[in-house]
Amino acid sequence: SNKEFKDSSELLNTLPFYTGHAQIFITSVDLIIENPLIGKGIKSYRNNCFSIMHLPNRVCESHPHNYFLDILNDTGFLGLGLILVPVLILLLRVYKEYLKGEARNNNISNWIYLAIILSVIIQFFPFKSSGSFFSTFNSAYTFLIIGFLLGLNEIRSKSDK
């Protein structure tokens, strides 16, 4: 069909997979651009989004509904690095331990490792819509998984000695 749209939000609303998160993401990216290095402060999205509501396709919500956008908006690239670098280092170390475990044929331990690694990857999957990273429930769940991973890694490294 040759239907013309007044603005891109009209077009977005016609897409079968559109959930409305695109507008939240656009708003979040606009706010990140304003202060990319250190962000605007924890849980600041809900207060700062009103400043750009006059632009098309912008929506004000309580948080950006994506961990990466949430962290970038609140703490900037500096905060994202401080959060992601240790998590990535941990995942690499644990993955190396997981590979060592395959050689030892310790199947239960390997399945636990794999489940925890996948939980962390799924939790931080960049394109999924999520709650606020800095909310109590989401942070508790994330750091609980990371704690399990650290504990399991410590147990495995001690058993190798």
Language-model segments: which ranges?
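Short, hydrophobic secondary-structure boundary micro-motifs
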Residues: 38-41, 58, 81, 133-137
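Hydrophobic transmembrane alpha-helices and their immediate junctions
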Residues: 75-124
